Structure formats: structure tokens, C-alpha cells
Amino acid sequence: MKRIHSLAGILLVLGLIQSSCRVLMQEADPSSSLEADSTLKDEPRELSNMKRHSEGTFSNDYSKYLEDRKAQEFVRWLMNNKRSGVAEKRHADGTFTSDVSSYLKDQAIKDFVDRLKAGQVRRE
């Protein structure tokens, strides 16, 4: 399938080169522009439809290629961020740490009050 798309792309590029050469030749020789106009009018409708189809196919394939490329770059970016060793803290990590700190602080206050009641702490 990729070979067909590559072939369509090559044919499209060759067609563009041929048409640009035709334009350059017409600019160089004004009498040939009349002949070129008549050949364009005589061009069969099927050929123009084929050109339009090949251009559409090429642009569609190119768009898919760009989307795939962006997806690959995004995956690489994700992988590089994980490999960099910088662990980003999540919100849950912060709340867990805060909860543990609050618990330990409350426990320390409770222990201090218990020692005060027992008379183990000196008052100065």
C-alpha cells in the first residue's frame, strides 16, 4: 500500500514538474501560448479528473503522514520525560504527605499534653 502511495506521489511531482516546464516555455515564446491554450481546452475530462484524484490522494496521504509523525513525536516526548529522572509529584502525593504531617503533629501534641498531665515535663 505504501508503494502505491509513493508511486502516486512521484507521479504527482513529475506532473508538477512537467506543468512548470510548460509554463516556462509559454513565457519564453508568446506564439506557443496560443497552442498551449488550445491543447488545454482539448484535454479530456477524464485526465483532469485523474489529476484531481491523484492530488487528493496525495494530500490525504501526506496529512496521514503528518499525523503519524506528530503522534511519534508525542510518544518520544513522553518517553524522554519519564527517562529524565525528574519525578514529577502528583497532587495525591502532596495531600498524602500533608495528611501524614498533620497526623504526626497531632500525635506529638497529644503526647506532650499526656506528659504534662503526668508531671514529667519541667516548667521553667
Curated annotation (Swiss-Prot):
Belongs to the glucagon family. InterPro entries: Glucagon, Glucagon_GIP_secretin_VIP. It is found in: Secreted. It comes from Lophius americanus. Residues 1-25 form the signal peptide. Residues 38-54 have a biased composition (Basic and acidic residues). This is Glucagon-1. Glucagon plays a key role in glucose metabolism and homeostasis. Regulates blood glucose by increasing gluconeogenesis and decreasing glycolysis. One of its GO terms (cellular component) is extracellular region. Pfam families: Hormone_2 (PF00123). SMART domains: GLUCA. One of its GO terms (biological process) is response to starvation.
